């Protein structure tokens, strides 16, 4: 069951509203932009965008459907040959409404409705790609840090236990031993890295 739109009609009767929207759409496609009241611009926007979508299909049936609304054949030709190809990649949003100051005579709110001329640039979903990249490096960096902390605590605990039991002269000797132990552990590590580089070359 057809139901009327909410709010007052443009012009009073349904036929007058259809004529107003038809004339506004014709002028919009002919000139590219028109200045009218905000309420007329808001009513024209979905009407004009449906006509552009039909023009994008470009077949005979849709041309006849557009000719029911826009009676000027030269404007329909312009719509199908010039305007519709510019919106081929754009999925919708062919028009833009910009509010301007009120009209001087009766203070009616005015607006400019125009066809969008900028090239369509689809936005890429950047948030989904950035999140996995940020989480991947984090575990790799934490693992070596925990190993070095564990080695340092083991080295620090060993001298403190020896100093409690030994005399001050012996503590000097025990402090030198961990340094020698660290040097001894570094030499095998260096040898293992040399062996791994030789294996990589082979």
From Swiss-Prot:
Q: Which PANTHER family match?
A: LARGE RIBOSOMAL SUBUNIT PROTEIN BL17M, RIBOSOMAL PROTEIN L17
Q: Which UniProt keywords apply?
A: Ribonucleoprotein, Ribosomal protein
Region entry Disordered: which residue ranges?
A: 130-202
* Molecular function terms, GO-annotated: structural constituent of ribosome
Q: SUPFAM superfamilies of this UniProt entry?
A: Prokaryotic ribosomal protein L17
Q: What is this protein called?
A: Large ribosomal subunit protein bL17
Where is there biased composition of kind Low complexity?
130-142
Q: Would the keyword Membrane turn up in this protein's UniProt record? A: no
Task: List the biased-composition ranges (Acidic residues).
Answer: 143-168, 177-202
């Amino acid at each position: 069951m057809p139901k009327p739109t909410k709010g007052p009609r443009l012009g009073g009767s349904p036929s007058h509203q259809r004529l107003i929207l038809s004339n506004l759409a014709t002028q919009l496609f002919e000139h590219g932009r028109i200045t009218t009241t905000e309420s007329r611009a808001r009513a024209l926007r979905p009407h004009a965008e449906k006509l552009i979508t039909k023009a994008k299909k470009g077949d005979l049936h849709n041309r006849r459907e557009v000719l029911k609304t826009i009676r000027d054949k030269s404007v329909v030709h312009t719509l199908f040959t010039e305007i519709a190809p510019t919106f081929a990649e754009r999925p919708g949003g062919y028009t833009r409404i910009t509010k301007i100051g009120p009209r001087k005579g009766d203070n009616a709110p005015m607006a400019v409705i125009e066809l969008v001329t900028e090239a369509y640039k689809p936005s890429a979903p950047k948030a989904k790609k950035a999140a996995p990249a940020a989480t991947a490096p984090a575990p790799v960096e934490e693992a070596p840090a925990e190993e070095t902390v564990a080695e340092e605590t083991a080295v620090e605990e060993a001298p403190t236990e020896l100093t409690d039991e030994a005399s001050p002269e012996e503590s000097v000797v025990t402090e030198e031993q961990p340094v020698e132990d660290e040097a001894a552990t570094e030499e095998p590590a260096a040898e293992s890295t040399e062996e791994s580089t030789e294996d990589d070359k082979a």
